[in-house]
């Protein structure tokens, strides 16, 4: 349950936040497949509360497990999983299984949500299926965090056989429809013992969608653990991966100048991070790009953000996830939508970028170029580490790829790239296209060394070359 089930030669999950199923299917075929992406994390596919103003967070208030949302119905969902899997791109469901709604109302499929009466007839859940109401207000008390209500959301009792059965059935239905795994929302707010039982009840992946016999769903759990609380991320690694929140905090701090890049030489568990095989890593996500504090880098701070993403994708640690946002000015703001609340599809520009209010970080050349880099260096380790003892670093991945960063001053060095002799295209400033480089090129000599130059005033403080972008 720690294997992402990527097709061969692919890596990275991109979170297509609030996209419609038919747009995701198109994106799998037209962009994610040719660029080597491994999979897509989708927004919650089950019925959720229709909230005033249609904020993004309404999707995290379930009303039922009917597959009918602003992103599409079950037939659109199945069309997406079929087309994406055919393209070698996996689908991971954002599974909201800790709670139901925080208010009364109606869901996206027309079902009623009786928050006050603890009654969700479309499931059905009644008052006996929830923990007694109390407020999550003490992160030094694990029982409070797990058995009370997070911001007023009715808290399901996963210790109940009935509730477990409903959740297992929902997740197994998703497996039947061809998904490769689940991001588990609010896992910290559920008991590891209960989650272990639920995940052990999941079917193997559906071989009709190209998965191997006996393949298990990939599980990666939201456990925000920045230290100092009663609950540890390590409680959840026995039955799945965990989203490593410390990763983005530490990288964001470094690339904003709060820590010298030379200190990244031992990046990984020595920094207090999970073991690599247990970790799904990211620079920002849909929550902390809004409320994560100044250390979290986002698309709004593009130069250091792209450098942090490049470091994440260049380094072997963890299973990587990339955020693909819609532009927002207000933290509650929902996705691009028309006057009736219908989602608007992203527009695709000639230069690969998006319009209609979508940021599409995954379509930035500096990002997809590094996904290609990660595929090219699969199976290698960090070698030829160099630093100027400050904010300039470089390293190779075996003899397959080489990357250099400056976060202070111009970098002009003759460095050992570890690569075979030849001329390579920098995949940050451009790419290999039609037999030539559209950006910078780097010539590696017979001894593996090359003159590397990276000016501090350039658009990007990173340069990357690999064997699949060689002239």
From Swiss-Prot:
Which species is listed as the source? Tenebrio molitor
* Annotated cofactor note: Binds 1 Ca(2+) ion per subunit.
Protein name, entry field: Alpha-amylase
What spans are recorded as compositionally biased (Polar residues)? 326-343
Assembly information from the UniProt record: Monomer.
One of the record's GO molecular function terms = calcium ion binding
Q: Which reaction does it catalyse?
A: Endohydrolysis of (1->4)-alpha-D-glucosidic linkages in polysaccharides containing three or more (1->4)-alpha-linked D-glucose units
Which residues are recorded as binding chloride? 183, 285, 321
What cofactors does the UniProt entry give for this protein? Ca(2+); chloride
Where Ca(2+) is bound, by residue? 98, 146, 155, 189
Q: Which UniProt keywords apply?
A: Calcium, Carbohydrate metabolism, Chloride, Disulfide bond, Glycosidase, Hydrolase, Metal-binding, Pyrrolidone carboxylic acid
Q: Which CDD domains match?
A: AmyAc_bac_euk_AmyA (cd11317)
Site label Transition state stabilizer, positions: 287
What positions are modified (Pyrrolidone carboxylic acid)? 1
What Enzyme Commission number(s) apply to this enzyme?
3.2.1.1
